[in-house]
Amino acid sequence: MSSGVAARCDAKKLVRSPSGLRMVPEHRAFGSPFGLEEPQWVPDKECPRCMQCDAKFDFITRKHHCRRCGKCFCDRCCSQKVPLRRMCFVDPVRQCADCALVSHREAEFYDKQLKVLVSGATFLVTFGDSEKPETMVCRLSNNQRCLILDGDSHHEIEIAHVCTVQILTEGFTPGAGSTRATGMFLQYTVPGAEAAAQLRLMAGEDASGSKRQAAAWLAAMHKATKLLYESRDQ
């Protein structure tokens, strides 16, 4: 992709919605696959009372809409202003207690795990039915739209085309707290192909530092997968 085309794909614009200022892509198709659309606000006439504590709205008890779920709350139940990066808000926005908790948890992904994904890690990568793995660095592109694999060959997989992600583990019973991520199985569609393609990433057995980096990358990818599925289910 030429630098000019890439710049147009990554271009953003500042828009004002009823919820606040948002920095969104010029073209919707080039948005982050982890993003969420703004919710439809519950109409004022349909919520005469707070949807949390049931307080009746009047001149003193004012009505507020949560910017994440769109429901109506009183000030006491919707007083927190929290960053909401999945909807591209420039400033922290008003959210109800439940939504604020979710947004706080997502902030860790954007502040820490996203940086791990973009930095990348080294894996042994096997494409399709090949029996020979290739040592490659796998990372998330800066615009969050592609997985980039670099080694003797170069591959880019659009996140939007990923259909299955399975984190591979080793250890004792899953959920017992003693397993560790060792790899990832990925299925994705290829434009023009009937069947889905697949690849397997496995952490190498070389330097311990490289293994730790790979484990951190896999943990971050596990969180990213959850956000990806949430965005698709919206």
Swiss-Prot record:
GO terms for molecular function: zinc ion binding. Residues 107-234 are annotated as: PH-like. Transmembrane segments: none annotated. Zn(2+) 1 binds at residues 50, 53, 74, 77. One of its GO terms (cellular component) is focal adhesion. Zn(2+) 2 binds at residues 66, 69, 96, 99. CDD domains: FYVE_ZF21 (cd15727). A zinc finger (FYVE-type) spans 44-104. It is found in: Cell junction, Focal adhesion; Cytoplasmic vesicle; Endosome. It comes from the Eukaryota. Keywords: Cell junction, Cytoplasmic vesicle, Endosome, Metal-binding, Zinc, Zinc-finger. The FYVE-type zinc finger mediates interaction with PTK2/FAK1, and also interaction with PI(3)P and association with endosomes. The C-terminal region exhibits a structure similar to canonical PH domains, but lacks a positively charged interface to bind phosphatidylinositol phosphate. Plays a role in cell adhesion, and thereby in cell motility which requires repeated formation and disassembly of focal adhesions. Regulates microtubule-induced PTK2/FAK1 dephosphorylation, an event important for focal adhesion disassembly, as well as integrin beta-1/ITGB1 cell surface expression. Interacts with PTK2/FAK1. This is Zinc finger FYVE domain-containing protein 21.
